[in-house]
Amino acid sequence: MDRSQKADAVAELNSVFNEAGVVVVTRNLGLTVAASTELRGKMREAGASYKVAKNRLAKLALKDTDYEGIGEMLTGPIALGYSADPVAAAKAAVDFAKSNDRLEIVGGSMGGQMLDEAGVKALASMPSLDELRGTIVGLINAPATKIAQVVTAPANKLARVFGAYGASEAA
């Protein structure tokens, strides 16, 4: 890799760090190519990305970003999982690590907040932004639905009474 390629790699990683909502650092020592490909696929399905990066270049790219603190974690064979959704990358990495003991979660960062392995696992157990939005919409919609049911209930009961009365007269 020549100097210009390294500069491009640093610039690309820097833009990744500036746009990411969360970065998860994993140690992938002994992870097979097939397992790594499977992990990339799971990350992609979750709306996240997974990238193996040279430690020195990643440390250079971390400068002047919210994730500067994770530079200490970049030792040995590492890879970075990242996503705009603060939960997606953590959830995909933790789920994959449960089934594959070769992947070790080192830690991560959410904005300026540093996370250790337990912090990443706790983050992975939280609902995603889409799930939270769905819950909020449901909570907002519930009172309106109940009001509509209460308003239409007397008319429905009256219609049933008339229907039953008409059926009994016909019989």
Swiss-Prot record:
One of its GO terms (biological process) is translation. The keyword tRNA-binding does not apply. Keywords: Ribonucleoprotein, Ribosomal protein, RNA-binding, rRNA-binding. GO terms for cellular component: large ribosomal subunit. One of its GO terms (molecular function) is large ribosomal subunit rRNA binding. The keyword Cell division does not apply. It comes from the Bacteria. Pfam families: Ribosomal_L10. Part of the ribosomal stalk of the 50S ribosomal subunit. The N-terminus interacts with L11 and the large rRNA to form the base of the stalk. The C-terminus forms an elongated spine to which L12 dimers bind in a sequential fashion forming a multimeric L10(L12)X complex. Belongs to the universal ribosomal protein uL10 family. PANTHER family: 39S RIBOSOMAL PROTEIN L10, MITOCHONDRIAL. NCBIfam families: PRK00099.1-1 (NF000955). Forms part of the ribosomal stalk, playing a central role in the interaction of the ribosome with GTP-bound translation factors. This is Large ribosomal subunit protein uL10.
